[in-house]
């Protein structure tokens, strides 16, 4: 068995990735979220597959097909609730995973980081097209508002929007193609995950100190397999509690009403995991400016490795940068709250200030703090 594990072409890859992989001995629970994201992806693909067997991507029957899944299909309600809340768990793990990368300087593995940013964008695109499929009020109007943002692109904007819609409004063609995208994108995500892991295993994992861990490595199995199993059980407990006891907690009540192009909901807003970006979009009273700020809010992650001016990798021994990091976290929570509020005072000004602070912390304050901490650590003899 040992020989097969180490010699068989496929088993050898699995062995080098999950069994005999040398891992730093001191990685904390913040390193669990990568494996949790893998589990989330598998859960989403499996539940999504079973939903796709019963769903119809037609404007006349989409809403009732979802109702049919919840009422008539064996455990359809559970599969649907797991899929909807699984998306929330996915994004929760994603945000923590990215936050961990920023805190401990994992972004200095540039290839891994850049593939990670592409993965984040792909997952966001998948979640957006998936939200349109139940064809409720918020599905329809969310699709209308967000796709309409592309009309801000000079010259080709309106043509591009109509091309994506497949007509002059969000209709049957739009729903059908969004279902096709929602089906194919998770498999593209799986391929990107493979590339992400390939680049990660070229360098090995980072660790909380940010120092070179080569002097003290342990095998991934059994140490981290058992640790990941514990993380999975905790996440599964939270997911199942959410899906069983309050499945509609994170959803929008408007989505219980079938899509109606003649009736606009009073407050159009996306799912909670997009609210921070939505708040940044709304904080600029100009269409093109808002779209650019929305893109920048995610794409700013790509330039983070270039903004690393400190001699230390991790924030573990950098108290000023730590304060800024947690200020950024609080700021993102504020933006999430603002994104769900109506466009009126005082929410407008709070959103604008939080948006400015978001970019200021990442682009200006954190690099400055890194330089300042280096300066404080320099020995100064009289």
From Swiss-Prot:
Keywords associated with the record: Electron transport, Heme, Iron, Membrane, Metal-binding, Mitochondrion, Mitochondrion inner membrane, Respiratory chain, Transmembrane, Transmembrane helix, Transport, Ubiquinone
Binding site for heme b b566: 97, 196
Binding site for heme b b562: 83, 182
Transmembrane segments: 33-53, 77-98, 113-133, 178-198, 226-246, 288-308, 320-340, 347-367
GO molecular function terms noted in the UniProt entry: metal ion binding; ubiquinol-cytochrome-c reductase activity
Pfam families: Cytochrom_B_C, Cytochrome_B
Protein's membrane topology: Multi-pass membrane protein
GO cellular component: mitochondrial inner membrane; respiratory chain complex III
GO BP annotations, alphabetical order: mitochondrial electron transport, ubiquinol to cytochrome c
SUPFAM superfamilies assigned: a domain/subunit of cytochrome bc1 complex (Ubiquinol-cytochrome c reductase), Transmembrane di-heme cytochromes
Residues at which a ubiquinone binds: 201
Cofactor note: Binds 2 heme b groups non-covalently.
Predominant location: mitochondrion
Similarity annotation: Belongs to the cytochrome b family.
Note, other: Heme 1 (or BL or b562) is low-potential and absorbs at about 562 nm, and heme 2 (or BH or b566) is high-potential and absorbs at about 566 nm.
Function: Component of the ubiquinol-cytochrome c reductase complex (complex III or cytochrome b-c1 complex) that is part of the mitochondrial respiratory chain. The b-c1 complex mediates electron transfer from ubiquinol to cytochrome c. Contributes to the generation of a proton gradient across the mitochondrial membrane that is then used for ATP synthesis.
Subunit structure and binding partners: The cytochrome bc1 complex contains 11 subunits: 3 respiratory subunits (MT-CYB, CYC1 and UQCRFS1), 2 core proteins (UQCRC1 and UQCRC2) and 6 low-molecular weight proteins (UQCRH/QCR6, UQCRB/QCR7, UQCRQ/QCR8, UQCR10/QCR9, UQCR11/QCR10 and a cleavage product of UQCRFS1). This cytochrome bc1 complex then forms a dimer.
Protein name per the record: Cytochrome b
Species whose genome carries this gene: Micoureus regina (Short-furred woolly mouse opossum)
């Amino acid at each position: 068995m040992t020989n097969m594990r180490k010699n068989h072409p496929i088993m050898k890859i699995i062995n080098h990735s999950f069994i005999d992989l040398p891992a730093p001995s001191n990685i904390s629970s913040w390193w669990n979220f990568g494996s949790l994201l893998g589990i989330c992806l598998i859960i989403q693909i499996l539940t999504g597959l079973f939903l796709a067997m019963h769903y119809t991507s037609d404007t006349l029957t989409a809403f009732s097909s979802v109702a049919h899944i919840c009422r008539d299909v064996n455990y359809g309600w559970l599969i649907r609730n797991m899929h909807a809340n699984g998306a929330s768990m996915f994004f929760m793990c994603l945000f923590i995973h990215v936050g961990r990368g920023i805190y401990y300087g994992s972004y200095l593995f540039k290839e891994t980081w850049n593939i990670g940013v592409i993965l984040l964008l792909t997952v966001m695109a998948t979640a957006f097209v998936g939200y349109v499929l139940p064809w409720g009020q918020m599905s329809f109007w969310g699709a209308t508002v967000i796709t309409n943002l592309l009309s801000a692109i000079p010259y080709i904007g309106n043509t591009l929007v109509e091309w994506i819609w497949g007509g002059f409004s969000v209709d049957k063609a739009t729903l059908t193609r969004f279902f096709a995208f929602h089906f194919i994108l998770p498999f593209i995500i799986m391929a990107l995950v493979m590339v992400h892991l390939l680049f990660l295993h070229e360098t090995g994992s980072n660790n909380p100190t940010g120092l070179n861990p080569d002097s003290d490595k342990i095998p991934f199995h059994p140490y981290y397999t058992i640790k990941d199993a514990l993380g999975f059980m905790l996440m599964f407990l939270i997911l199942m509690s959410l899906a069983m006891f309050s499945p509609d907690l994170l959803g929008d009540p408007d989505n219980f009403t079938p899509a109606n192009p003649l009736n606009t909901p009073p407050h159009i807003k996306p799912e909670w995991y997009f609210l921070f970006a939505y708040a940044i979009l709304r904080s600029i009273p100009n269409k093109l400016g808002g779209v650019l700020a929305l893109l920048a809010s995610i794409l700013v992650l790509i330039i983070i490795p270039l903004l690393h001016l400190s001699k230390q990798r991790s924030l573990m021994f950098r108290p000023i940068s730590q304060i800024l990091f947690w200020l950024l976290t609080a700021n993102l929570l504020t933006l999430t709250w603002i994104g769900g509020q109506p466009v009126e005072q005082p929410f407008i000004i709070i959103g604008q200030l939080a948006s400015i602070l978001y970019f200021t912390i990442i682009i200006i304050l954190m690099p400055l703090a890194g330089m300042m901490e280096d300066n404080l650590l320099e020995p100064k003899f009289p």
